[in-house]
C-alpha cells in the first residue's frame, strides 16, 4: 500500500525534506505534508547576501525570506536548517550567468539553479538526512509510471506552470522529487496558507532574478565580465553602420526597443557578434527560423534518446518560458541534436531552453530539452525536411 507520496510505509515513518524559500508555495508544501503526518524537515538555502534585496518585494532567497521560512517552521513545529550555499551559487549560477551574456547568449539562471543547487546539492543533503524524498513548491507535477519510475508533467495551473525551468531534471532526481502543489491553483494555495494560519499567505511572489536586487542585470555582468560592456557598432544585415552601443550584454535576440537608431522601418536585434562586438539588426522577417541546434540535451521520455529520435520524433517544443509549445520534430544522435519547427519561430535566442513536451496543452508530459546553441537562418533552415514517423505517446494523469 502506497502513501500519498507513492512510497511504501506510514507517513509518520517517512521523512521528507522540504526546500523552504520563505514564500507561500514552499510554506504550504511543508504545512500540507506535516498535516498528513509526515516527518518533515525544512531546509532553506542562503544563496547570496545583498542588503538592498533582503527587504525588496519581488526578490527571493534573501534575508527576509530566511526569516519567514524560520517562522513558518516554528509555526508548524518542524526542524529547520539554513545552509550557506553562497560560494556554490556564485560559481554555478552567477558566474555562468555573466559568462553566458558575455558570449552573446540570453541565459535562464533559474534552470541552472534548479539543476545544480536545488536538485543537485540539496537533494544530496536530503539523502544524508535520511529523507525518503525531497519536496518543493514548484508548480509542476510528477506521475508514477507502471514500472515504478516517474514522469514529469505540467501543472494544473497553466498560468503558474514551471515545467520549462525543470527540463534538466534527470530521471534519478525525478524519482526522488515530489511536487505537492502540482494539482492546485495559486488561489487554492493561498487559501490553504490562510487555513494553516501562515503569515506568508499574502506575501508577494518572487519575480526578479534573485541575485539582481536592483533589477539591472548589467550591473552584475559589468562587474564579472567587463568585456561584455565594451562599446561597439550597431550594423544592418549588410554591415552598414547605423549607430553605436555600450555593450552587447544590453541586448538580446528579438529586441526592438532601446536600439537608439533611426530607421524608416522597425528594426530588431538578429545577431550578437562577440568577436567584433557588433549588434546586427534587421527586419522582423530576419528573426524567423525553422531549425534550432541544441546542446546539453536531457531526455526523460521513455527509452533511450537516440532510439527515440532514430527516425525523427514528433513532439512539441517551447523556446521561451512565455511562449506556448509548438509542433516540431527532433532528430540527431550521439550528442548532436536539432529541432525542426513546423510553423517556425521568431526571436529564438541562444542560451534559452528548448523544452520538449508530448502535447501542446493540458497536463502534457515533459520529455526533456536542451539549451539553444543556435538558430539557423530562414533561408537555409527549410531545406530537406523529412517528416518523422515516430510519435511520442502522452502520459495520462
Curated annotation (Swiss-Prot):
Record's signal peptide: none
Function recorded in the entry: Catalyzes the 2-thiolation of uridine at the wobble position (U34) of tRNA, leading to the formation of s(2)U34.
Site feature location: Interaction with tRNA: 138, 352
Record GO terms (molecular function): ATP binding; tRNA binding; tRNA-uridine 2-sulfurtransferase activity
Disulphide linkage map: 113-210
Coiled-coil spans in chain: none
Gene3D superfamilies: Adenine nucleotide alpha hydrolases-like domains (2.30.30.280), HUPs (3.40.50.620), Translation factors (2.40.30.10)
GO biological process, one term: tRNA wobble position uridine thiolation
Keywords, ordered alphabetically: ATP-binding, Cytoplasm, Disulfide bond, Nucleotide-binding, RNA-binding, Transferase, tRNA processing, tRNA-binding
Family: Belongs to the MnmA/TRMU family.
InterPro entries: MnmA-like, MnmA-like_C, MnmA-like_central, MnmA-like_central_sf, Rossmann-like_a/b/a_fold
Residues binding ATP, per UniProt: 19-26, 45, 137
Residues of the active site: 113, 210
Catalytic activity from the UniProt record: S-sulfanyl-L-cysteinyl-[protein] + uridine(34) in tRNA + AH2 + ATP = 2-thiouridine(34) in tRNA + L-cysteinyl-[protein] + A + AMP + diphosphate + H(+)
GO cellular component: cytoplasm
EC number: 2.8.1.13
Main localization (coarse): cytoplasm
Positions of transmembrane segments: none
Domain of life, source organism: Bacteria
Protein name per the record: tRNA-specific 2-thiouridylase MnmA
Location in or out of the cell: Cytoplasm
